[in-house]
Amino acid sequence: SAEGLLMYLPPEAQDRLFDHITALSAPGSRVATEYHPDGTAALGGSNQSLGQRFADQGLDLDITTLVYAGERNPVGPYLRERGWQVRERGRETVFADYGRSFPDSDIVARLRNSVAIEAIRL
């Protein structure tokens, strides 16, 4: 699983990660991750809010410096083109599939548009 990892990688490194995973995966192998279709733009305001919460606790960290901006390849199509069967679900659908409602809070609002990716190597 590469959940929570992709936004911390430069766009080219994201592609290389999935290229390496594909090269090393036998048929039937699985990978799971999430993808933010609007990139890090949607995360910016929330990251600043979260950064302020950390600062209030004495942690001097600019969270926006931890993520990489830039145009990324959408993960689902990228994996499909490389021989993976891909299932994509919006975050609210994932919550509903587990019988949960999506929380209405500032902290998780930035995840509302994220897409959960599950893929099986063909």
Task: Provide a role label for each language-model segment.
Residues 1-122:
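Alpha-helical subdomain
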